[in-house]
């Protein structure tokens, strides 16, 4: 079982007198920066010129270039997209690190797959909230928190664990609980969850169900409601109380259908395919492919995204969501 730390376990916050540079001011960046500041930390933000720079300024932060922020900080938290981190680290962060500094991540991808190679004289750890930035910020402001993971990759000072827990405490995560892990475990389980279940698995399942109904002659609008729209209702029940709560909350007919039909859809062959996905994550195949795709300008990424956005389920969904003003995306989808 995972070891979990709470507020009572952080008796002395060893980072309170240190300067923390938050590199990036997107979903996680703004939440980390604001939570740390509210908890009395000395926070600066490191960015390239753009909308985020202006937003961080409006929010009252001292904003610098990435290099300037890294140079003056004791703790550098990198909250940029995975594919951008290696270049920014190499050009702007690495030259400004000093012995005893802390290099921090919210995901272990680049360290685990050797895209970022920290010097031996700095602490390296991760603190990864298990929720999007807006939720990290909102729950903190309400007096609660989102649980987080932490892991130490390199302990140059002998107090890297204390630093990691102090950072987690600073963003409020110790209110809910902070689970100890490793860079390897966090990276591989996170990627697997995204690919096999949360993103890849769910989208493939939803599309397959939609296509099955439409191909059988049912109206696309009904297929959308049954296979996509109502998914949130079921996921919310699982989120609140696990599979048991979902099954308790639905009809007996639905629960019996779950028991007799679910295993025929997600079969042993499906689990074998999941095993292959996991193996490709573990041996670096996925990482190498994604890194190569990014370096090539992401042609397949953009082409696939465009094709997926033209699928009938998306066309029907846009139409139906237009009839439901209470269903609005938090962020308008577009080109990344």
Swiss-Prot record:
EC number, UniProt record: 1.1.1.86
Domain KARI C-terminal knotted: residue ranges: 182-327
KARI N-terminal Rossmann domain span: 2-181
Residue numbers binding substrate: 251
Essential cofactor(s): Mg(2+)
Protein's GO biological process: isoleucine biosynthetic process; L-valine biosynthetic process
Annotated binding of NADP(+), by residue: 25-28, 48, 52, 82-85, 133
Chemical reaction(s) catalysed: (2R)-2,3-dihydroxy-3-methylbutanoate + NADP(+) = (2S)-2-acetolactate + NADPH + H(+); (2R,3R)-2,3-dihydroxy-3-methylpentanoate + NADP(+) = (S)-2-ethyl-2-hydroxy-3-oxobutanoate + NADPH + H(+)
Active site: 107
Keywords: Amino-acid biosynthesis, Branched-chain amino acid biosynthesis, Magnesium, Metal-binding, NADP, Oxidoreductase
Binding site for Mg(2+) 2: 190, 226, 230
Amino acids binding Mg(2+) 1: 190, 194
Enzyme class label: oxidoreductase
Molecular-function annotations in GO: ketol-acid reductoisomerase activity; magnesium ion binding; NADP binding
Cofactor annotation comment: Binds 2 magnesium ions per subunit.
Pfam assignment, any one: KARI_C
Function description: Involved in the biosynthesis of branched-chain amino acids (BCAA). Catalyzes an alkyl-migration followed by a ketol-acid reduction of (S)-2-acetolactate (S2AL) to yield (R)-2,3-dihydroxy-isovalerate. In the isomerase reaction, S2AL is rearranged via a Mg-dependent methyl migration to produce 3-hydroxy-3-methyl-2-ketobutyrate (HMKB). In the reductase reaction, this 2-ketoacid undergoes a metal-dependent reduction by NADPH to yield (R)-2,3-dihydroxy-isovalerate.
HAMAP family: IlvC
Protein name stated in the entry: Ketol-acid reductoisomerase (NADP(+)) 1
